[in-house]
From Swiss-Prot:
Belongs to the DNA glycosylase MPG family. Its EC number is 3.2.2.-. It comes from Desulfitobacterium hafniense (strain Y51). This is Putative 3-methyladenine DNA glycosylase. InterPro entries: Formyl_transferase-like_C_sf, MPG, MPG_sf. The lineage of its organism: Bacteria, Bacillati, Bacillota, Clostridia, Eubacteriales. Keywords: DNA damage, DNA repair, Hydrolase.
């Protein structure tokens, strides 16, 4: 699989969010590879977007990586326990990002099962199998993504997104999830998901 280059990420988050669908997120951990096919994303358009951490040009140590240019990871924690993985888009100084909300397991399902449920994959029931990666926090836990990977270069060899040959995709557009604080921005249709995937977090 071909790794995505910097130019892929150096575009508006709305474009990148759609085009990440069907791509494969890969994390190489001490010689072991875990990967998952991206099936749900959300675009955050930075300074103009009331749902974005960088809205209004907000610049704190937490969001600094969003200002650093395209193709880097932005990992933050919610509720004090769940990590969320984002890819930074647009040029330096234009703090946009795409949240990866859900994915379908590809490689390393045994490690994912241990990370999520402390069980072997063959011990999981159907609900647990779908629950491996069908939400942003679940995805991060399954793929061993945490705060230590904040700012990771996604054009490197440790954490990256790769192309996968695929047929045409049926993409659904919807409102983003869990941003009721964002006033009118909570209604923007900036969430995208694959219609036929069972791993989408919310339909």
């Amino acid at each position: 699989m071909k790794r995505l280059g910097r130019e892929f990420y150096n575009r508006d988050s709305l474009i990148v969010a759609r085009e990440l669908l069907g791509k494969v997120l890969v994390h190489e951990i001490e010689g072991q590879k875990v990967s998952a096919r991206i099936v749900e994303t959300e675009a955050y358009r930075g300074i103009e977007d009331k749902a974005a951490h960088s809205y209004g040009g907000k610049r704190t140590p937490r969001v600094e990586v969003m200002y650093g240019g395209p193709g880097f990871s932005y990992v933050f924690i919610v509720y004090g326990m769940h990590y969320c993985f984002n890819v930074v888009t647009r040029e330096e100084g234009n703090p946009q990002a795409v949240l990866i909300r859900a994915a379908e397991p590809r490689e390393g399902s045994e490690l994912m099962a241990q990370n999520r449920f402390k069980k072997s994959y063959h011990q999981l029931n159907k609900s647990q199998i779908l629950g491996l990666t069908n939400g942003p926090g679940k995805l991060c836990r399954a793929l061993s993504i945490d705060k230590s990977l904040n700012g990771e270069d996604l054009c490197g060899s440790k954490l990256y997104v790769a192309e996968e040959s695929q047929e045409s995709l049926s993409i659904v557009t919807a409102k983003r999830v869990g941003i009721d604080y964002a006033e009118e921005a909570k209604d923007y249709p900036w969430r995208f998901y694959l219609e036929d995937s069972q791993y989408v977090s919310v339909k």
